[in-house]
Amino acid sequence: MVGRIHIMGDTINSGSWTASAGTEQTIDTITQANNNQLVRTVEYTLHFNQGNNMQAQKVLVMSNGTNAFSQEYGIMFNTGTPLVSIAATIASNNLNLNATPNTGVTGTMEYYISRKTIR
């Protein structure tokens, strides 16, 4: 094994924004100051509420410091279609998790996040 792997505990966050279909919103940011802080993998558990509508899911994110890759899975929702789609990006040394409301989704969107990080 080369070097060390750091597995960070659960980080819990919540918030809300005014959703507009197709408009991306950053819901979590992890700073990668240098190679020692490079985020390798993040596992997210997410929950979204919009009125009586809700969605829960997992997202697995990996990063090489330049690009971010994400895979949504375990997606559950109580509406005809999911409320949001999730993707990860890297900008200004930050790993961002973004939620994009799907067609027809507008208004106040609440979110709850739990994450585990491997650096």
Residue ranges and their predicted role:
Residues 76-119:
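Low-complexity intrinsically disordered segments
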Residues 1-12, 44:
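Low-complexity, small-hydrophobic/phenylalanine-enriched stretches
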Residues 54-63:
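Short, surface-exposed beta-strand/strand-loop-strand elements in extracellular ectodomains
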Residues 41-43, 56, 83, 108:
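Exposed beta-strand and adjacent loop surfaces of beta-rich binding modules
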Residues 12-41, 49-53, 67, 102-106:
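Surface-exposed ligand/attachment interfaces on beta-rich extracellular proteins
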Residues 6, 45-47, 60, 98-100, ...:
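Residue-level recognition of well-ordered beta-strand positions that form the cores
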Residues 48-50, 63-65, 117:
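Beta-strand elements of well-folded, non-transmembrane domains
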Residues 62-81:
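Terminal beta-strand-rich extracellular "head" domains
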